[in-house]
Amino acid sequence: MQTLKCVVVGDGAVGKTCLLISYTTNQFPADYVPTVFDNYAVTVMIGDEPYTLGLFDTAGQEDYDRLRPLSYPSTDVFLVCFSVISPPSFENVKEKWFPEVHHHCPGVPCLVVGTQIDLRDDKVIIEKLQRQRLRPITSEQGSRLARELKAVKYVECSALTQRGLKNVFDEAIVAALEPPVIKKSKKCAIL
């Protein structure tokens, strides 16, 4: 059985762990516990072929900037996450996460993933953002950023409601199995 390695990166508290736990167990975790490093595995059928999808959760906090890349070797696809209710996490996709991933793993396909879409229309959240002269990130902004960064595509989901959740991983699998022709088909390696 072929294994595909999917590494999830993004700022702390954007919902990376919830995304993985909700997808692998169909349950939403109750507590926030910052991740250092964790991994999950699921078996998925693609056509008639079973694949093991190895899902690697990483720490978004700056304290782990030197450790995090140790999880990158042999990655087949990256999910670069931000929360649609955290404009700073959206900016960091471009300013921090894409540069980091491409530095360590040039040519490995990346998807930009907007998380927490169930909160995009939450009145309390919107008011809180408006007090800071901010607003939730739209699907159009996510798609535009993905095009600008030459990501495979933009997808979004809610780990709480599971809306769009399966699609995130379906798209990641497709990207890992059929990397775009313009990119190198090599897996990530740290020298």
Swiss-Prot record:
PROSITE patterns: RHO (PS51420). Its main location: membrane. Disulfide bonds: none annotated. The modification Cysteine methyl ester is found at residue 188. It holds the Pfam family Ras. The keyword DNA damage does not apply. It is found in: Cell membrane. CDD domains: Cdc42 (cd01874). Changing residue 12 to V: Enhances interaction with RGA1. Interacts with BEM4; the interaction is direct. Interacts with AXL2. Interacts with RGA1. NCBIfam families: small_GTP (TIGR00231). This is Cell division control protein 42. It comes from Saccharomyces cerevisiae (strain ATCC 204508 / S288c) (Baker's yeast). The lineage of its organism: Eukaryota, Fungi, Dikarya, Ascomycota, Saccharomycotina.
